[in-house]
Structure formats: structure tokens, C-alpha cells
């Protein structure tokens, strides 16, 4: 169920704040955005990417020197949508700290590793999975060939970025991503996808 569907069912909790000027209610995600916390929950697609990118840009405009926390619980999804988030994370001035809560797979794991080095975290029972780019082209043989070349170029691009983000040799990343490669939180730390596994706030 997407966040939009949950919102449609009225299942997103509301937070009521009281001040000298009266009372104000926020949905929980808007309230957390005030604390510079962004969530990516569910599939990475154009809609979720647009929401995340907009929030990143908004928080940069609010304070370009204060970190942004990016919580990820995602099975992955669209490469182009994920790369829009990745590029924005690198483009903006604030450091983006990432945290895996639950599951970060495919593009979800890629974005987890894209956080500021030293500020990439996972909860202890989270799982992380990396693999190669998936594609499905239909149509004339010539068009399929064009798409295949593009997928191979994208695969190479993502492997190079993942090698740089993790510190692993490119050949190891290529080999490990040939098939679904599952890691525990501690294994993800050893691999370089995250920097620390956190059980409790300090």
C-alpha cells in the first residue's frame, strides 16, 4: 500500500501542537519534515522521487548548513527515478544522512549507500540487497538492441558509483550484483554500504 493510498484511508496519524497562538495539526510526515526527516517507503517511482526531491530542495532552502535525515524502507524500483534522488542528494549543500529501517533493496540500497560517508546507518534487523539493473524492452529487434545497450551502460554506471560509495573493487561489485545479493545490517557495514549499525539512540 502506497503512502498516498494510506493517506486516502485516513490512516496517517495527525500531530496536534499547541502554542501561544493556538493549536495547529500536522500529518506525521509533515511534522517530521520540520525536524528535517524525509521518508522513502515503498517503491521508487516518479511520484515518490518527485516528493523526495522536492523535500530535499525545500530543506536546503530552509537551512543549507544543517543535515537532512533520510529514512529508507524500500524494495527499489525505477532507475531513472532513483537517479533523480541520488543526483539531488549529491547536488544540495546539506549532508544527507541515510538510515535503513526494515529493507533497502536494489535502488533502495543504492540510495542508502549514497548518503554522506560516515553518516549512513542501519537498524540491526534491517536487510539490504543489491543486484544488477533490471529491464524489459519490447518491440522491434533494433529497438530492443538499443535498449539493451542502454541497460548495459546504466549497469556499468551504477556499478562504478557503488564501488566508489562502498570502497569495494569494481570487479567485486560487478560480480556481487550479477544476482540478488542479500546482506544483514552488519554485513552491509563490512561491505561499505553503511557506516554504522545502531540499535539505540545515544
Swiss-Prot record:
Q: Which reaction does it catalyse?
A: Hydrolysis of proteins to small peptides in the presence of ATP and magnesium. alpha-casein is the usual test substrate. In the absence of ATP, only oligopeptides shorter than five residues are hydrolyzed (such as succinyl-Leu-Tyr-|-NHMec, and Leu-Tyr-Leu-|-Tyr-Trp, in which cleavage of the -Tyr-|-Leu- and -Tyr-|-Trp bonds also occurs)
Kindly list the places in or outside the cell where this protein is found, as annotated in its UniProt entry: Cytoplasm
Protein name according to UniProt? ATP-dependent Clp protease proteolytic subunit
In terms of CDD domains, this protein maps to: S14_ClpP_2 (cd07017)
Q: What's one Pfam family here?
A: CLP_protease
Query: What is the role of this chain?
Result: Cleaves peptides in various proteins in a process that requires ATP hydrolysis. Has a chymotrypsin-like activity. Plays a major role in the degradation of misfolded proteins.
State whether it acts alone or in a complex, and with which partners, per the record: Fourteen ClpP subunits assemble into 2 heptameric rings which stack back to back to give a disk-like structure with a central cavity, resembling the structure of eukaryotic proteasomes.
The record's EC number reads 3.4.21.92
Single GO molecular-function term?
ATP-dependent peptidase activity
Catalytic positions? 106, 131
Which keywords accompany this UniProt record? Cytoplasm, Hydrolase, Protease, Serine protease
What is the name of the gene encoding this protein? clpP
List GO terms (cellular component aspect): cytoplasm; endopeptidase Clp complex
Give the HAMAP family listed for this entry: ClpP (MF_00444)
**To which species is this protein native?**
Variovorax paradoxus (strain S110)
Biological processes, Gene Ontology terms? protein quality control for misfolded or incompletely synthesized proteins
Q: What class of enzyme is it?
A: hydrolase
Amino acid at each position: 500500500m502506497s503512502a498516498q493510498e494510506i493517506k486516502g484511508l485516513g490512516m496517517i496519524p495527525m500531530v496536534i501542537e499547541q502554542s501561544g497562538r493556538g493549536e495547529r495539526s500536522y500529518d506525521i510526515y509533515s511534522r517530521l519534515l520540520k525536524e528535517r526527516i524525509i521518508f522513502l517507503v515503498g517503491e521508487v517511482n516518479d511520484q515518490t522521487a518527485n516528493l523526495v526531491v522536492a523535500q530535499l530542495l525545500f530543506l536546503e532552502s530552509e537551512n543549507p548548513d544543517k543535515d537532512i535525515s533520510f529514512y529508507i524502507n524500500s524494495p527499489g524500483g525505477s532507475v531513472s527515478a532513483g537517479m533523480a534522488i541520488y543526483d539531488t542528494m549529491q547536488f544540495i549543500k546539506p549532508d544527507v544522512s541515510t538510515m535503513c529501517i526494515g529493507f533497502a533493496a536494489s535502488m533502495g540500497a543504492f540510495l542508502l549507500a549514497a548518503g554522506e560517508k560516515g553518516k549512513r546507518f542501519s537498524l540491526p534487523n534491517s536487510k539490504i540487497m543489491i543486484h544488477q539493473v533490471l529491464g524489459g524492452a519490447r518491440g522491434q529487434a533494433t529497438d530492443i538492441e538499443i535498449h539493451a545497450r542502454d541497460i548495459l551502460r546504466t549497469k556499468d554506471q551504477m556499478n562504478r558509483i557503488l564501488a566508489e560509495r562502498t570502497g569495494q573493487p569494481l570487479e567485486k561489485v560487478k560480480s556481487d550484483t550479477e544476482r540478488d545479493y542479500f546482506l544483514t545490517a552488519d554485513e552491509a557495514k563490512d561491505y561499505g554500504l553503511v557506516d554504522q549499525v545502531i540499535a539505540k539512540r545515544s
